[in-house]
Amino acid sequence: MFPRLSQLETRTIAEILRTETAGGAVLIVAAVLAMVWANSPWAQSYGTVTGFVPWPGGEPVGLDLNIRHWASDGLLAVFFFVVGLELKREFVAGDLRNPQRAAVPIVAAVSGMAVPAVVYTAINLHAGADALRGWAIPVATDIAFALAVLAVIGSHLPSALRAFLLTLAVVDDLLAIAVIAVFYTESVNVVALLSALLPIAAFALLVQLRKTWWWALLPLALATWGLVHASGVHATIAGVLLAFTVPVLQRRGRPGLAERLEHVWRPVSAGVAVPLFALFVAGVSLRGGAVAAALADPVAIGVVAGLVLGKLVGVFGATFAMAKFTRATLDEDLSWLDVAGLALLTGIGFTVALLVGDLAFGSGSERGEHVTFAVLAASFLAACLASVVLCARNAAHKRVRGPH
């Protein structure tokens, strides 16, 4: 029924998955499947599968995790490894190494994280300390999801818009990683954390020597992940730490190792890790008054307002202020309506938002379910609003430039 793919077919699928657009499309499909499954006659099986513990004997080493936790702690480590490679490449050899070019997207990213956090906090100020733990949920943008929407509606939009979104998202990812590491680590096992430096150092030595021995690198990566997990720091940070050791610059005319590893692992991240995370985390029941309960929760209201309103005000406001009060100028191909559409697009928060929701309120909790619903609703609303603005701008650019 499912014949084995040829080498050419395998390569073709991998190339497709290397594009953010395809990754976003697969992510959307996985999220929809999760929602359908969680609200189908087989909804009970969804809870059974996500709550299943594959290795009950792993309790002594803290690895008696259920499927949902393996998805958020394990699979997302691959996603953060790819993000880390991209971050280092951008800072060493990309746009972010030029302070003048990087200034506007960096300020826009910082403001686009700060304003949603303020909006969320203002709404939940009197909802109790527990509610305030979710302040970081609306701060991050899901770049794969956002680029998938942009690709569908923006065939004639200037390339500068996509480049700005990509650069902003890189900074956004870096700050989101810092937020998770600093604010969502409750206690640290110093011995385990220091022990993680040993496999990291060995991994760094091999990659600096350009030795891509998978039989050595993979066990070192797994050891790093296990020790970081045991330390109390979220295990996905292990992926970032390992990525930062990989050299970026070329040698003897060959692409840098960071680029080559990103080329290998991006399809795994986009086609397997992130979609499975979405499948096992995004399923939330909409039956029996669940929607009404979520809409009455200030946490859910704060998440929606932060993503949709906070991102728009933060990104657009910072970009406008930079153009108004500094020497920075808007690209000649762009208008402020283009920037407004892009700012709305950054309100699509998914992967990191769901992860932070789990860290803040616990996976499977009632409030955690409200957060999942809010993230999905806000992302859908932001995508719709951005589509309205950018479709109009796409038509305008098409008239100016012609159909080609």
Curated annotation (Swiss-Prot):
Reactions catalysed according to its record: Na(+)(in) + 2 H(+)(out) = Na(+)(out) + 2 H(+)(in)
Keywords: Antiport, Cell membrane, Ion transport, Membrane, Sodium, Sodium transport, Transmembrane, Transmembrane helix, Transport
GO cellular component: plasma membrane
Keyword Transport in annotation: yes
HAMAP family recorded: NhaA (MF_01844)
Family: Belongs to the NhaA Na(+)/H(+) (TC 2.A.33) antiporter family.
Protein name: Na(+)/H(+) antiporter NhaA 2
Classification lineage: Bacteria, Bacillati, Actinomycetota, Actinomycetes, Pseudonocardiales
